Amino acid sequence: MVCFVRPRAGVGGALAPDDSARLLAGATLRLGDATDAASLANEGFRGERFDALVSCLASRTGAPVDAWAIDHQAHVHALAAARQAGVGHVVLLSALCVQKPLLAFQQAKLAFERALIESGLGYSIVRPTAFFRSLSGQVDRVKRGKPFLVFGSGTLTACKPISDADLGAYLASCLDDPSRHNRVLPIGGPGDAITPRQQGEHLFALLGQAPRFKQVPVALLDAIIAVLGTAGRVVPALAAKAELARIGRYYATESMLVWDAAASRYDADLTPSTGRRTLADHYADLAQGRATNERAEHAVF
C-alpha cells in the first residue's frame, strides 16, 4: 500500500514526513503535491501498476477556488494517473451534502463524481454524514460554564455522526465488498439521528450541568451573507468570506441525512448506519481529557 501525502501534512502543515510515517505505519509513504498532475504521476504512481485508488482528498475551506482546484481538478488528475497505472477500482470519499448542491464545493464534488462514474472504472462513492470533529467545537465553552449555541430552536437539522475510525473501516471494505461496487453510498454512524439541541443535552449530562442554550437566529447569517456578498463585488477577499458564510448557513439549516425527493424531506430511516462509536462516546473522551479535537476548518462555532 502506497500513501501519497504532502511534505507538510496535518492541520497547518504541522506534520513532518516522519510524523506522517508514524501515523501510517506499514504503508509506503510518498511525498508530493496532489494538485500537480506531474507530481502525482512522477512522485506518486512512479510508473508502477496499482489495483485500486482510495481518495480522501478534499478542500479545507470549501471556498470556490480551492473547491474546483482540489475537489474536482486534483481528482481529475488522479483519475487520469490511475487509469495509466491500471487501476480497476476507485473508492472516493465524497459528502452527503451534495444531494442538494447549493454551494461551490458541492458542485465541484458532484462534477468529479460524474466524471468517475462515466470513466468506465469501477467505483464506490462514499457520502458520509457529519464528522465528530465538526460537532465538537463547544465542549470547551460548555466546560467553562457557557451556554450551548444553537441556530433557531436547535431542532432545525439532524444527523447521524460518524467517527473517523468507523468511516475508515467502511471505506476500506469498499475495496473487496462487491455489494458496494459501482454504487453511491450514503453512510452515517450508529444510533438514531440527533439534533444540535440533543447534542448539547448529551454534553451537559456528561458534565453534570443543567442544560443552557443560547439561540442564534438564522437571519443573522442571512444578513452577514448579504453584506459580504455586496462588498465582495468590490473586494474579492470578502466574496470568499461570503461563501464561507453560505456554507455555515447551509449546515445550520440542512440535515445531514438522506434526502427523500419523493417526500421532499430528509429521512433518518433511509440513512444507513455503520460502526460502533457514537458522538456521545467522543464527547465523553473530550470531557475527560482522553482525546483532543483538531477541528481546523471543521467548525461553525
Feature names for model-found ranges:
Residues 219-301:
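A hydrophobic C-terminal alpha-helical subdomain
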Residues 6, 16, 85, 99-211, ...:
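Oxidoreductase cofactor-interface core, primarily capturing Rossmann-like NAD(P)-dependent enzymes
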